[in-house]
């Protein structure tokens, strides 16, 4: 049996041992906390920009997905139009365009070659042949340029299957651009064919009046899916109305 001094000495040694264990544990916890903070800081530094990009990318994907769905529905409606309806409603759109001061005063007008029952503006090419220079788009892999229209004999199908002029590229000023589209809304937002050719081209000609052209069923009263960066038309023309 231990004497009282021996028992006292043992108690002191045990107490010191527990104190040292507590100190080591505390130091270990501090080190772990510091290490975790350091890892978190490195993570933020490395991935914060990617997280921001992801937050921006997700809404973009959702909007583009909604645009694609709406585009498919309206394109199907347009493809089902009867030829006589295309002709009569296109004539009404042309009548609306001819009323516009910007068209009457324009010397150089860019329009498009219609496909899949788009509004057909080709009668303008013949009617104003001696008064205005008409330009048609020519598409490349990722870009679009314009060339003067010089009759059907000078037209050849491009890589998208759309007839294009074989005349020299035009680099001068354009007074008016008549823009095709699949869907528009009353705030003049536009959903195009999906290739982005017009978006890129129009962004380089912001000073030029840009007028969207469509049938009445292609015009939505409420906002269609769009990004803040998407360019709005200056005006949208339908067979029965003009939206400004």
Regions found by a protein language model. Name each.
Residues 192-197:
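Charged helix-capping and loop-helix junction motifs
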Residues 2-16, 45:
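N-terminal, intrinsically disordered charge-dense segments
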Residues 19-21, 53:
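Short hydrophobic alpha-helical segments enriched in small aliphatic residues
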Residues 46-65, 69, 76-80, 172-177, ...:
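Surface-exposed, charge/polar-rich loops and edge strands
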Residues 16-17, 24-27, 38:
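Polybasic, lysine-rich low-complexity intrinsically disordered segments
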Residues 118, 185-186:
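Short glycine-rich, flexible loops that bind phosphorylated cofactors or substrates
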Residues 122-126, 198-203:
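Short amphipathic alpha-helical segments and helix-helix/interface helices
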Residues 33, 46-164, 168-172:
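N-terminal active-site beta-alpha-beta segment that forms phosphate/nucleotide-binding
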């Amino acid at each position: 049996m231990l004497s009282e001094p021996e028992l006292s000495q043992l108690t002191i040694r045990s107490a010191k041992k527990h104190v040292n264990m507590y100190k080591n544990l505390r130091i270990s916890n501090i080190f772990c906390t510091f290490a975790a903070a350091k890892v978190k800081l490195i993570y933020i530094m490395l991935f914060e920009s990617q997280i921001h990009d992801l937050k921006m990318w997700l809404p973009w994907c959702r909007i583009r997905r909604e645009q694609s769905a709406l585009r498919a529905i309206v394109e199907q409606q347009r493809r089902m139009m009867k030829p006589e309806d295309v002709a009569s409603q296109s004539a009404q759109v042309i009548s609306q365009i001819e009323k516009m001061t910007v068209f009457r005063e324009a010397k150089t007008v860019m329009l498009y070659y219609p496909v899949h029952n788009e509004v057909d503006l080709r009668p303008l090419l013949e009617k104003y042949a001696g008064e205005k220079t008409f330009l048609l788009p020519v598409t490349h892999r990722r870009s679009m340029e314009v060339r003067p229209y010089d009759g059907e004999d000078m037209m050849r199908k491009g890589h998208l299957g759309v007839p294009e002029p074989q005349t020299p590229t035009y680099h001068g000023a354009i007074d008016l651009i008549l823009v095709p589209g699949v869907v528009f809304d009353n705030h003049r937002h536009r959903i195009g064919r999906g290739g982005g050719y017009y978006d890129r081209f129009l962004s380089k000609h912001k000073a030029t009046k840009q007028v969207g052209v469509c049938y009445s069923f292609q015009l939505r009263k409420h906002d269609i899916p769009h990004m803040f960066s998407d360019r709005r038309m200056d005006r949208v023309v339908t067979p029965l109305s003009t939206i400004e």
